[in-house]
Amino acid sequence: MRLGILLPLAFVPASLAGQTPDPGPASAPASSYEQRYGEVMALEPRADRIAQVDNLVLRRDVAQFSLASGTLYLLSSVGGHTIGAVFQGRGTFSFSPPTRIEQDRLVRFQGTRSLEVPFTELVLLFADTTLAELERKLTFNQAKMASDPRPVVRKSLEYLSSDDDKSFDPDLMAAFLNGESSDLFYAHINRDRGSPLMFMLNPFEFEGVTLAIRAPRIAWTRRPEVICQFPRQGPPVAAGVTTERQGTATIRHYRLEVTLAQTGMGDLSFAAAARLEIATASPVGPWVPFQLFSKLQVDSARWEDGAPAQVFRGKDGEQLWVRLGRRLQPGETAPLLLYYHGDLIDRFGDFFFIKSSIAWYPRSLEGRSYATFDITYHGPSHYLIASVGNLTDSAVAGRVLTTRWTTTEPIRNASFNLGLFEDYRVREEGISPVTVMVSEQAHRQLSRVLRQQGVLVLEQRKMKETVGSDMLQSLKFFQRVYGTPPAAHFYATEIPYLHGEAFPGLVNLSWITFQQTDQQGEDQVFRAHEVAHQWWGIGVDFATYHDQWLSEGFADFSGLWYLHAARGGSDKYFGMLRRWRMNIFDKRDEPSPIWLGYRTSSSKDQTAYQVLVYEKGAWVLHMLRILMLELRTAKDDRFTGMMQDFYRTYRGRRASTEDFQRIVEQHIGTSMEWFFKQWVYGTEIPTYRVAYKTDRVEGGQFRVTLRVVQEKVADDFQMYVPVTVDLGQNRQGRFRVNVRGPRSEIVLPLLPAEPKGVTFNDLEGVLCDVKMVDW
């Protein structure tokens, strides 16, 4: 069919071609998702819209496309409008990240601080003024194609789409579905050498400039991996941004009716009826995308007035598209009734696997928008269930237990857990009560199965009592050092996974931590980490992915602090810090700063996020703790007061790294720009080569002189390092010394007795490597 169209066009006189400019991207909204998707995936070059290129330059933010010579084809229309082009010939792509952090990322992945790469093929998709610019700078005519660019276009689309579930990049697809104009621009660059590059300018992301490469191939799939991402040039991003997206539909209130029915095999089916109040802060639609767990299928949808609602849901896809009746304006809501079901819960013995703890209901693209929830669960009466929210009603009818849970304040994530649990309640006056839910029968079954396979798994006695004690004691400790938590009741349930999860008033813990408690403190830190999220991540949320260490790093440190202060585990505390330090040292060859959040992990290193955001983030707080420690009395009062102030100031809000820095500076009383630059935004870790000598001076006193050589960091790198001098007879002298620059000689205050030894970097006050050498 396409050949039948192309061949006659080859004979159209050139004088008839290009007289009327093609319409830009703005057009009427699509009546069908699948039809518009089909048009996008069928994009191909037009024989009647071909231009010869000679030194054409396109500039988009920090990127420049210099098309030296070749042929440019406009692509077939989508919704009656031109939204793409393909170029074949010789060109150069230039890209210069504006910040040191993003330049370092480019070095890590491409070996250079700025790109200047030749290319032979370029595919463009756009909703901006690109078409008008091309028509202004080029002359389009009917011509015979020198080569076939269709495979180039087809392969470029594979990086944006999945034909299995008919999904496409949601921001590009929203533009094509809604026929809207914006600054949206995408370029797929096939360079002379190496894998392709993908550049995108996205006005719906606060960090709207991205550069991606091809991720390592998994089978035959093609997927992009972002290596650089930063805000667009021009007016600076407003201070205090606490979201990563704009111009996106959200859901401000959920009313969910969940049915968990037992099947004949003892499994649990899942079905839900959801009333969603769709809202927006800026005009959107009529097509708007949401996310939903891939194994959930939509049965039907209608508006609150009973009219059918048009939705699209690809098979095993994560996107859920809803067509509103019209474009939604700020202040308006569109209540949607959605009915869906699917394979959400698996069973192994008496363990139940909830496959997605957060995407079991439709969510906005950002995934972090706040909403209130009213959730009713219907499930087998012999199962216990725990959920976010306050339990407002519970009744049994026949063999069905119905419970209702509501939230009084907007929250970011809602979840639940259920199983053949026994509950164990722990209470102490002045502390929110804790209900522990565990299936000890499931543990016994699992132990038998593993023994049959030759695997011996230790099983601790008093599982629920052991875990319950850490839950209550960590709550008690955090309430003392941080403040009152946001929830009035806490549930600690077990999940058959190796990780933990925290939601408002609900903590899900790995079955392993119920099965046994290790001797190094790992389990106590793990349990307390999840409890600490009630303060860090829930009580105080993080602003953007750059600030996620304020949740995960803070929670890791909190677990350590609990181990140290509440459980008397000083040796375990410092032992764990040292193990984390070794993990951090392992990342020194290809480092990333904490500030990169989830982007610290990549195809090159999938463990970096855990090590840098969690463990190094905890180290940052530990260093601040030691920096603020009263050395004479070993009291944490200043540090504790600072943490309480931060929690009190930002409770119920999102906080950024800059917000935390301001609180730190208020309590320390001076600028801490250098500290955050080094440890949050930087990647350097110092090595200290330390020598000391002791001299007797007049009056029977002794003088200690330190010589410190600082390596592997910039010349202006500085830290205040704790030094302890052993004076014998259980006496010590404690000092802080400022180490700055490649070489320092530091004279300590005179001492009343001859030193027996000197400990440099006592209390692990600095994340560093210390090597003691002779004078």
Question: Where are the language model's segments positioned?
Answer:
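Acidic/His/Gly-enriched intrinsically disordered linker/tail segments
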Residues: 552, 556-623, 627, 650
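Zinc-dependent metallopeptidase catalytic helix centered on the HExxH motif
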Residues: 353, 377, 472, 508-581, ...
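N-terminal, polar/Ser/Thr-rich
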Residues: 18-271, 363-367, 673-674, 678
